[in-house]
Amino acid sequence: MKTAEKTKWDILYDPQKKSLFARLEEFVINVYFSDVFTKAILSVSNIKNGKIFEPGSGSGMTCGKFAEKGFDVTCMDLSENALQKTKSVFKHMDLDGKFTLGDLFHTPIKDEQFNVVFNQGVMEHFRLANLDPSKGVKEMLRVLKNNGTLVILVPAYFSPLFFVYQFFKVFNLLEKYWPYTNQDFLHKHELFEMMEKAGCKNIVVKRLWSSFFFSMIGYCKKE
């Protein structure tokens, strides 16, 4: 990953530089959406125990929910600040986890290690940065065990968040208030094609109603 991209995420997770909107977003994710995403992933994977990996774990709250349920959790992020945030979350919740500094496109993990590999709020940032997100999905598949479940959650096109983003964009307020200036909102067919290009089979893509349709979920089993 480009050094500029790494620096951008380190700034985002620097508590001294975090914008008001970024703080609000993190609060909402921590309070509500991490629980929604955890339930959705458990539902589509039908997993009761095992190893879970989140490349692009951010603040680590969703991984924390899985650790609370007894799963063996590995969190990976490009940003050292994000990993420090995750470690503090796990320490505060008295949870065990593994933490890896790494790039989704060159994951420093051996093949076929996990029962579930997921991320949320990650794959929408690559196309506008001239990166092919399917290469990241391919890496996620590589570290997933056979018959394991791959899950990707992204902001949906024409979701409530999409219209808020467009408002900020029209009035040139993204740089000042929005945490991500290169955020993408995906159509169903775009997420499907991203996963298909990476080699996924029997893909399911749908809007996640429990997120108030803010998010879209794509998932498949590794065959």
Q: What are the residue ranges of the model-derived segments?
A:
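A short SAM/SAH-binding and catalytic strip from SAM-dependent methyltransferases
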Residues: F118-L131
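Conserved class I S-adenosyl-L-methionine
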Residues: V151-F171
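Conserved N-terminal segment of class I S-adenosyl-L-methionine
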Residues: M1-F105, V116, Q120, V137, ...
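Core SAM-dependent methyltransferase catalytic element
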Residues: A198-C200, R207-E223
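Acceptor-substrate binding/catalytic loop of class I
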Residues: L173-H189
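Short conserved loop adjoining the S-adenosyl-L-methionine
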Residues: H106-D111
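A short glycine-rich, Lys/Arg-flanked "PGG" loop and its adjoining helix->strand segment in the class I
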Residues: S134-N146
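A short hydrophobic/small-residue beta-strand
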Residues: V73, L150-V151
